[in-house]
Amino acid sequence: MSRICELTGKGRQIGHNVSHANNKTKRTFLPNLQNVTLLSDALGKSVKLRVSTHGLRSVEHNGGLDNWLMKTGDDQLSANARKLKKEVAKKLAEKAA
């Protein structure tokens, strides 16, 4: 299972451990990923995702999964999130018509 957020696309970063003597050794910084089930109001079902805590806070701040997907540009979304956004947009268009 890859260590990438399914909503934001946030992944691992590479850096250094730095000792007191300023010796540098390579290390990786991993995102804090959580397995969550988010409810989509438009689709009327729950969606299981592996999301970073930063992504989860963003979703809650914007008032839910559907609102967050609609407000976020496609260039900032991962492939799974773009697919989910397309489904939500289609359902919202059907409800509006």
From Swiss-Prot:
Q: Among its keywords, does the record have ATP-binding? A: no
Q: Name one Pfam family in it.
A: Ribosomal_L28
**What biological-process terms (Gene Ontology) are attached?**
translation
Keyword Ribonucleoprotein recorded = yes
Sorted alphabetically, the keyword list is: Ribonucleoprotein, Ribosomal protein
Q: Which Gene3D superfamilies match?
A: Ribosomal protein L28/L24
Matching InterPro entries, A to Z?
Ribosomal_bL28, Ribosomal_bL28/bL31-like_sf, Ribosomal_bL28_bact-type, Ribosomal_bL28_sf
Which cellular component, as a GO term, is one annotated location? Answer: cytosolic large ribosomal subunit
Q: Which GO terms describe its molecular function?
A: structural constituent of ribosome
Looking up HAMAP family in the UniProt record yields: Ribosomal_bL28
**What family is reported?**
Belongs to the bacterial ribosomal protein bL28 family.
Tell me the protein's name: Large ribosomal subunit protein bL28
* Protein's organism: Sphingopyxis alaskensis (strain DSM 13593 / LMG 18877 / RB2256) (Sphingomonas alaskensis)
